[in-house]
Swiss-Prot record:
EC identifiers of the protein: 7.1.1.-
Major location category of this protein: plastid
GO cellular component, one term: chloroplast thylakoid membrane
Coiled-coil blocks: none
Membrane topology category: Multi-pass membrane protein
Keyword NAD: yes
UniProt protein name: NAD(P)H-quinone oxidoreductase chain 4, chloroplastic
Family annotation (InterPro entries): NADH_Q_OxRdtase_chain4, NADH_Q_OxRdtase_chainM/4, NADH_UbQ_OxRdtase, ND/Mrp_TM
Transmembrane annotation, as ranges: 4-24, 37-57, 84-104, 111-129, 134-154, 167-187, 208-228, 242-262, 272-292, 305-325, 330-350, 374-396, 416-436, 462-482
GO biological process terms, semicolon-separated: ATP synthesis coupled electron transport; electron transport coupled proton transport
Family assignment from sequence similarity: Belongs to the complex I subunit 4 family.
Gene name for this UniProt entry: ndhD
Amino acid sequence: MSYFPWLTIIVVLPIFAGSSIFFFPHRGNKVVRWYTICICLLELLLTTYAFCYHFQLDDPLIQLEEDYKWINIFDFHWRLGIDGLSIGPILLTGFITTLATLAARPVTRDSRLFHFLMLAMYSGQIGSFSSRDLLLFFIMWELELIPVYLLLSMWGGKKRLYSATKFILYTAGGSIFLLMGVPGMGLYGSNEPILNFETSANQSYPLALEIIFYFGFLIAYAVKSPIIPLHTWLPDTHGEAHYSTCMLLAGILLKMGAYGLVRINMELLPHAHSIFSPWLMIVGTIQIIYAASTSSGQSNLKKRIAYSSVSHMGFTIIGIGSITDTGLNGAILQIISHGFIGAALFFLAGTSYDRIRLVYLDEMGGIAIPMPKIFTMFSSFSMASLALPGMSGFVAESVVFWGIITSPKYLLMPKILITFVMAIGMILTPIYSLSMSRQMFYGYKLFNVPNSYFLDSGPRELFVSICIFLPVIGIGIYPDFVLSLSVDKVEAILANYFYK
């Protein structure tokens, strides 16, 4: 056992190192950009080293635990720890944030503030995934909201203030329910607040109170995931944000809601989750169909990709609601898989916009000829998004399917119905995905424009795309690379349920 504070260093390094950016002399953006990339790389290497040498995969208990008394008057502790459920999202956060920083090279206005906000968001996300205390989880949950709001409102499109305001209203409104639930759970049955996850997991609540806690937390996570009908902030936000911010939103931010749903609602409130799980299955199924159908009608490229993200997160919701080892493992695999695919699609959409300055699909066409590298990578990730065999999306969705079919909690006919509707959603996915590629890359519209000349993907864009594509293929070929991280923890969570 290592007593070195690995997790504390991993959580605080980005925001503290980012604070020093403001003391840099005004010598252009290059120094700030490379400093930020080096911090992200150092953070990713530290995380990888700590997990490789100090984390036991076959141990479902919390590891690398840290517990320091922070505020005496509230009995508030700085509690950190990781297990098989959090290690995957933490590594995903480090990987995507590093590549998003590299993708942010075109940002030149207020570069120091921009890169500081990315590093502050990094700390908040890592802190959320590694917190072992309800109040600390809430603080980290809120910490990354302010950087996202500023990134949206200062480095976005024409309607950036509208989308940023809509984002903060939705997320802050959801956080109110989280803020009310955290002290309620901590103070129940005791004058002293009990906020650590382990004690809360062993706490029993009256069923009515547990349902109230569950529903309040569910609203907060439904905004972040997002779950319909609390999803409407997402297309507007993605439509206006810079594509490096979109990478962080699609790759990491959406996954925090699903993580909270498993970590707190499913692990700490098992009886309420058993009651709500059929409704999660129904909502997830509707979400797949609704978002896939709506995506086909979007003319804005980034909004179409945003609705595809909503559709794919429906599989995660269904996997969580299945209450089976296979279904929950599939949901976690889908979290990781879509983190890569969603970030890559937004990155490639942004690099295309940098060249052609068009965002509406009906204005595009024919850019496969002048930009074959972007065409190849975008087509590859579109195939991954529609769950082509051999890629991570196919494995994740197949595992979720199998989890539903084998669930003993549900009768045969509801399982067949849900599986059938999900299959329809998977048929709709190629419709919006392939039509998006056709409208962008095929035809001769832009190619025939007089004096048109578009540069293809450069080394930086190609490097980012390949770095994301390799794990998509790797997980598709060998999914145990991710599943082995969570399988023991999933068994421990489901041991509290009557249906397994």
